[in-house]
Amino acid sequence: GPETAFLRL
């Protein structure tokens, strides 16, 4: 979910 995009920082 959206949390994955955050982890890709």
Swiss-Prot record:
Keywords in alphabetical order: Amidation, Neuropeptide, Secreted
The organism's place on the tree of life at top rank: Eukaryota
Role played: FMRFamides and FMRFamide-like peptides are neuropeptides.
Subcellular location field: Secreted
Family statement drawn from the similarity comment of this UniProt entry: Belongs to the FARP (FMRF amide related peptide) family.
One GO term describing the cellular component: extracellular region
Name recorded for this polypeptide: Extended FMRFamide-3
Modification Leucine amide, positions: 9
Biological processes annotated in GO: neuropeptide signaling pathway
Source taxonomy: Eukaryota, Metazoa, Ecdysozoa, Arthropoda, Hexapoda
